[in-house]
UniProtKB/Swiss-Prot annotation:
Residue stretches making up the Ferritin-like diiron domain: 21-180
Annotated localization: Plastid, Cyanelle
Regions that span the bilayer: none
Annotated residues for binding of Fe(3+) 2: E71, E128, E162, H165
Cross-link (3-(L-phenylalan-2'-yl)-L-valine (Phe-Val)): F17-V127
PANTHER family cross-referenced by the UniProt entry: RUBRERYTHRIN
Main location: plastid
Protein's UniProt keywords contain Protein biosynthesis: no
Note: The name 'symerythrin' reflects the protein's high level of internal symmetry.
Binding site for Fe(3+) 1: E37, E40, E71, E131, E162
Functional summary from the UniProt entry: Exhibits oxidase-like and peroxidase-like activities in vitro.
Record-given protein name: Symerythrin
Any one GO molecular-function label of the UniProt entry: oxidoreductase activity
């Protein structure tokens, strides 16, 4: 499969996050969150960091590494609150992992094309914006409505972190576009 930079999304990753499932159950939302945060920590952001480094942008690579680390911390926070929760990769996460593997297999081509890093940044911005403005605020609200204030507080903390990530990525994208 060749990369098609004219696609609306970056190898389908945008679609994965737009289609993220929200449940009417705080436990299910926590499981979904752990799954997605681990995917971002272990797969998506390390790949984006490598694209940045190979594109000659080590600062952006370091930013993606920092975001990956914090996404892992989000998963750990929720895992502590839900130590008994069984988390399995959904079909959507398995598909996203397959898409990242495709990107990794073509990483030299992606990194050598200026659109590759731009699309990685655009995807990251979209992901972090969805999480900070839609997904986690809704999860926090539902947890509070269901009387689970500890989990609501955790989701609210994640909102702040995801907002910070969105701001970092937005600045990096703006800076990249200025020099392009």
């Amino acid at each position: 499969m060749g990369l098609n930079y004219n696609q609306e999304d970056f190898m389908g990753l945008d679609r994965f996050f737009q289609d993220a499932v929200s449940h009417n159950n705080t436990d299910a939302n926590a499981a979904s969150s752990i799954e997605v945060e681990m995917y971002e920590c272990d797969c998506m952001y390390p790949t984006f960091a490598e694209i940045a480094r190979r594109s000659g942008q080590p600062e952006i690579g370091a930013m993606f590494d920092a975001i990956a680390k914090e996404e892992g911390m989000h998963a750990q926070l929720l895992t502590k609150l839900y130590s008994e929760l069984e988390v399995k990769d959904s079909a959507e996460t398995l598909e996203a992992k397959r898409l990242v593997s495709t990107i990794e297999s073509q990483i030299d081509a992606v990194a050598s094309d200026s659109r590759g890093l731009r699309r990685a940044l655009e995807t990251a911005l979209e992901v972090e914006t969805i999480e900070s403005q839609k997904t986690y605020p809704a999860f926090a609200k539902l947890a509070a409505e269901q009387g689970n204030m500890e989990v609501a507080t955790a989701f609210e903390a994640i909102v702040k972190s995801e907002t910070k990530h969105a701001n970092w990525v937005k600045r990096a994208l703006e800076n990249l576009l200025e020099v392009a």
